[in-house]
């Protein structure tokens, strides 16, 4: 499973405060909220929370892309995230 392999890689290399770990946590929250919203389409509070988390993850990814392009590419490949058009 992709999740377990990514967790092991992140725990071996980085600490919990690292950008990669934060993006990983946001990605898990996004996937959980997305599956929740498929069942509860009118849960507007969860929709708002999802948008906030998406924004936070986007800002962290932009920071990582600016600071270390190689780590950014590896992370989006591991988490199966699409690259934004601005990067």
Swiss-Prot record:
Keywords from the named record: Chloroplast, Plastid, Ribonucleoprotein, Ribosomal protein
Keyword Zinc applies: no
Cellular component terms (Gene Ontology): chloroplast; ribonucleoprotein complex; ribosome
UniProt xrefs under Pfam families: Ribosomal_S15 (PF00312)
GO molecular function, one term: structural constituent of ribosome
InterPro entries for the chain: Ribosomal_uS15 (IPR000589), Ribosomal_uS15_bac-type (IPR005290), uS15_NS1_RNA-bd_sf (IPR009068)
Major subcellular site: plastid
Coiled coil feature spans: none
Domain of life: Eukaryota
A Gene Ontology biological process term: translation
Keyword Chloroplast among record annotations: yes
Subcellular location: Plastid, Chloroplast
Subunit structure: Part of the 30S ribosomal subunit.
Family: Belongs to the universal ribosomal protein uS15 family.
HAMAP family xref list: Ribosomal_uS15_B
UniProt name for this protein: Small ribosomal subunit protein uS15c
Originating species: Solanum bulbocastanum (Wild potato)
Gene that this polypeptide is encoded by: rps15
